[in-house]
Swiss-Prot record:
InterPro entries: Cyt_c-like_dom, Cyt_c-like_dom_sf, Cyt_c_1A/1B
Gene3D superfamilies: Cytochrome c-like domain
Recorded family membership: Belongs to the cytochrome c family.
Keyword Ion transport set for record: no
Protein name as annotated: Cytochrome c2
Post-translational modification note: Binds 1 heme c group covalently per subunit.
Lineage top rank: taxon: Bacteria
Lineage of producing organism: Bacteria, Pseudomonadati, Pseudomonadota, Alphaproteobacteria, Acetobacterales
GO biological process terms on file: photosynthesis
């Protein structure tokens, strides 16, 4: 299904309680996972200074809101072999909120 409207304020809270374990929202600052600053609209596997999995590099994905909505639900299903260990967020509203926040990071 398609994403419900997201709330970037709630998304920021979710990012800073869930995503922050492996990612940052700061340009150029990678952790276990790559920085998600500017991720919306970016091609997968290209954040400088991050050692991506071959699966992510070769996926050919562009991180549109729709793709992120599906990926955050089932990362391993969308990019089999991804290093992302997060099992996924089943709640569509939480996914939409996180994406709404990611869209503000530019």
């Amino acid at each position: 299904g398609s994403a419900p409207p997201g709330d970037p304020v709630e998304g920021k809270h979710l990012f800073h309680t869930i995503c922050i374990l492996c990612h940052t929202d700061i340009k150029g600052r990678n952790k276990v996972g790559p920085s998600l600053y500017g991720v919306v609209g970016r091609h997968s596997g290209i954040e400088p200074g991050y050692n991506y999995s071959e699966a992510n590099i070769k996926s050919g994905i562009v991180w549109t809101p729709d793709v992120l909505f599906k990926y955050i639900e089932h990362p391993q299903k969308i990019v089999p072999g991804t290093k992302m260990g997060y099992p996924g967020q089943p709640d569509p509203q939480k996914r939409a909120d996180i994406i709404a926040y990611l869209e503000t990071l530019k």
